[in-house]
Amino acid sequence: MKILIAEDDLASRKFMHKFFSEYGECDLVVDGLEAIEAYMMSIKEEEPYDLICLDIMMPKVDGIKVLKAIKELEEKNNVLLANRAKIIMTTALGETELVKEAFELGSDAYASKPIDLKKIKQVMEKLSLIG
């Protein structure tokens, strides 16, 4: 499985990397602009991500705008529905409006911080990423 972790907080990024690396190859980015660039590169190289873990509050470009960009790139590049990355939005905020917007834009799941690994594993099972 190919995984993109977009997280600006170093401790959270390391924590998520340690967990997700058990399931596949992880690329790490620290801001929204890098996330968009990494996604574009994965499409160009025809090695799309299976999972994107995307922080809502990031520098340069926030997670909501990154999500919009990913969905637009999927449409533009005619990425088949079955091949589209599963997206888990994360945030330490209790911003229900942002979470609602993320789901409306096509996020597959949401995880609040601090990340509960048991819940993330359940989400991955629900999304058919792991058995």
What are these regions (language model features)?
Residues 7:
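Conserved acidic carboxylate
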Residues 14-21:
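Charged docking surfaces used in two-component/phosphorelay signaling
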Residues 21, 28-41, 63:
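Helix N-cap/capping motif at the beta->alpha junctions
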Residues 37, 64-83:
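Short amphipathic alpha-helix used as the core "switch/output" element in two-component signaling
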Residues 58:
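Receiver (REC) domain active-site loop signature in two-component systems and cognate sites
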Residues 112-113:
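A Lys-centered signature of the CheY-like receiver
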